[in-house]
């Protein structure tokens, strides 16, 4: 089925838009040292610095894998599998990102509700990526 020219519009890729929210949240948290009190130990400051670097690296990798997967329009089973691998890597990094936030909360002794919005955005991103992968399974079932 084709869409008439007057009814065409840009596709809003929700997982792509949400990715930028996750990035902005992380930058804000890092700038604020994850809400740690001013009198935290030097070891905790160093830990925050190390984990912050890994968090930003993971977020940039999520974006990279989303871009790579989205740039592959599968014409055969191999291309479909390659696209799926990149989707899976992005999904895995979302879980890893949540784990890093949990580790920081435990290290700093912050309350569970401190990063609710940020964690919610990551979970939403993960669900969007899974829905995208599921949609691909339906769209390209004749290739697999």
Protein language model regions, located:
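Amphipathic alpha-helical assembly/interaction segments
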Residues: 1-144
